[in-house]
Amino acid sequence: MKEITIALVGQPNVGKSSLINALSNAHLKVGNFAGVTVDKMEVGLIHKEHQITIIDLPGTYALNDFTTEEKVTKDFLEKGQYDLILNVVDSTNLERNLALSAQLLDTNKKMLLALNMWDEAQKEGIKINTEKLSKELGVVCVPTSARSKEDRLNTELLLDEIVRLYSQNTTNNENIKVPSQSFKESLKYSQSAQRIAQLVISENQQNASFEHTYKIDKILMHKRYGIFIFLGFMFIIFSLSFLIGGGVQKALETGFKFLSDGIKENVANEDLASLVGDGIIGGVGATVSFLPLIVVLYFGISLLETTGYMSRVAFLLDGILHKFGLHGKSFIPLITGFGCSVPAYMATRTLQNYNERLITLFVIGFMSCSARLPIYVLFVGSFFPSSSAGFVLFCIYILGAVVALVMAKLLKLSVFKGQTESFIMEMPKYRFPSWRMVYFSIYTKSLSYLKKAGTYILVGAILIWFMSQYPKSDAAMKAYKQESLLVNKDTTLSSEAKEEKLKELKTELDKKNLKNSIVGRGGAYLEKVFSPMDFDWRLSVSLVTGFMAKEVVVSTLGVLFSLGDQNEKSDAFRGILRKEVSVPSGIAFIVFVMFYIPCFAATITFGREAGGIKFVAYLFIFTTVVAYAFSLIAFYATQILV
């Protein structure tokens, strides 16, 4: 079977992801370029006995060295191993896209042109003469549409053309050199694009869609209440995630509890039963049960992104962000931080100003990622009535964003002083949501979450279980055996009373063994550090394990609080939390989780993006001080108010 490697190149917002998913019917696989923290996307498929690998390069307007995307794309085109270039252009904005196409043609590599969003161009009255365009460029041009299965156009034809072009014996396998554009060269490419566009676009009638966009923008982009509309959307998303996802979550909790109890009742070996029931199922199950809430959150944010609304919010907030030392482009990394800090850190590469980029990097962690959502849901459900849970959750996220702005201003005034840059960004058109893209977004992110639960969260839960079980206390075990013997010999007690008494003795033994374990001994020292907020050793230990992954906080608590009557765990041990943790401590714990250092993977990504290990040390100090200070304030404020 012959192998074909394709470099997929195009400007931002031309639908490359939609096209690549339509071609492959698969999900993109993420891989890192060596030494650069920018993602490339790879997908493989088989077509007519050819193994085709498509490499989706970062969206770029030109092959210069101005932005990281441009550098990465240019570097791959010069040094990467590929057979041909598939240039994706937006049919509704052909002239602007052809400037990049003209530059790609100068590489002398085999090339195809995909005229994407062809259906939208037709609706807008734009008619493109593809034969004339192919003649002018000297490459095959294929109209494509990939937003949905119903509207899919020419995907098979495009694959046929890829195979045909590859089969031609004109491959240039030598490394090429793409020179950076001077102003004169940029002007040449722009004039060439303008000339070709005028030749091939035979009709361009304005239609009602432009008027509709203008009317929608007058409302959503209003300079006074536009921000409140955005906050309203976010409030609805968070409320629905608690309302809809919460019901499914409780069903999952019940299922995991039933499974855990069944194993502990039917497995004879007590340690093995505890490992599987409390360690594996209790730890991993506590994490997996929060997936429905995360799915609803991803769904809401994906809808806002695919309609083109999120990019407009960046413009809407540019003035506010500049006042706090940030840039309008900072909004995209910040809002991405609600999903995961890793891609959020990577998204800062669009910021050209060094100081603004570092400020954004330092405050992204205050935007609560989806991994923290299970912790919030657990504690909000424990200390607040269900009727107000959605509002409290919304306030948590808003507070994180407000603190991020305040800290950004402090960093701007103290550490990262300098001039700000103006904001130039393409405004995409409003579009109906692509349900296929929304599905792919939710699917891939949910799958990533489940993979975490099945890998290092599982490992973390098992490690926490072992460290919480060993070493056993010989003295406690000896006392337990003696007292159990006395209870069994006591003829004055009924069988029910004996069973209850033995259960109390077992609970006491478990508590003593836990305090004598590795976790218990380490937690005793950590408890001193967090004593001002009255965190017990279990809460303290969970914060440390949370550095591995924030989801591990819930699984750690699930293991450490798995004592006593297991029937009390009906609501993901919320009842136990209410008994064991005071309201001020619970609120302080939420606040600390909001602001302390992100997970290990995110921290490593931060270090690469910021410029080295010293910045990781700065991040640890910065986030720890902020988290501790605000947690302390929350603790004493709650004590006064409650």
UniProtKB/Swiss-Prot annotation:
Pfam families in the record: FeoB_C, FeoB_N, Gate
Disruption phenotype: Cells are unable to colonize the gastric mucosa of mice.
GO molecular function: ATP binding; ferrous iron transmembrane transporter activity; GTP binding
Name by which UniProt lists this protein: Fe(2+) transporter FeoB
Covalent S-S links between cysteines: none
Keyword hit for 4Fe-4S: no
GO cellular component: plasma membrane
Originating species: Helicobacter pylori (strain ATCC 700392 / 26695)
Name of the coding gene: feoB
Keyword Nucleotide-binding: yes
Family: Belongs to the TRAFAC class TrmE-Era-EngA-EngB-Septin-like GTPase superfamily. FeoB GTPase (TC 9.A.8) family.
